[in-house]
A protein has these predicted regions:
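Charged, low-complexity eukaryotic segments
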Residues: 1-26
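Short A/G/S/P-biased low-complexity tracts
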Residues: 152-156
Length: 162
């Protein structure tokens, strides 16, 4: 009888452990999904408008002998990016050494847009420096906000001999 009670106790303990693990997995999955939905919702201004404007600027700059490269970052839990962002840089077609900084446009939690710069695409976020631009919101990207940032990148590119 004692061995049967022990067996039942062990089985009940195993079942509790399995249920606790399942509950933790479901909680983590729900948190992950909520973060992904929030990230996607805040990405909307970048997805639709910014990429269209950058593509237009890319075509215009190609006619002028320069190239615009950009990288749009989508949600990836492994990268630990909290905010949607797009990075772009303007460089010469023939001389890649002449280039602007990499401009990083990021939409933070409260809908504010933060513009920062770093030297190259591979540089870590610890090297980001604030860009001296006016405070923006995601909605202002659809007006002249993004164009101003692209113009600043073009000005920097020209100053570096582009």
């Amino acid at each position: 009888m004692a061995s049967e009670d022990l067996r039942e106790y062990l089985e009940a303990a195993r079942q509790r452990r399995v249920h606790e693990q399942d509950a933790r997995k479901q909680e983590m999955a729900a948190r992950h999904e909520a973060r992904r939905r929030d990230f996607d919702a805040r990405s909307e201004p970048l997805n639709v408008h910014v990429v269209r404007v950058l593509e237009g600027a890319r075509a215009d700059l190609a006619e002028a002998g320069a190239k615009l490269e950009y990288k749009f970052h989508s949600y990836n839990a492994g990268k630990q990016l909290e905010n949607p962002r797009v990075e772009f840089q303007i460089a010469g077609v023939g001389s890649p050494g002449t280039a602007s900084s990499v401009y990083v446009i990021e939409i933070v939690q409260d809908g504010q847009v933060v513009v920062r710069t770093k030297r190259s695409f591979g540089d870590p976020d610890t090297t980001l420096t604030p860009h001296g631009s006016a405070p923006r919101t995601a909605a202002s990207l659809k007006d002249v906000g993004l164009t101003d940032v692209i113009k600043a990148a073009i000005d920097e590119y020209v100053q570096h001999g582009g």
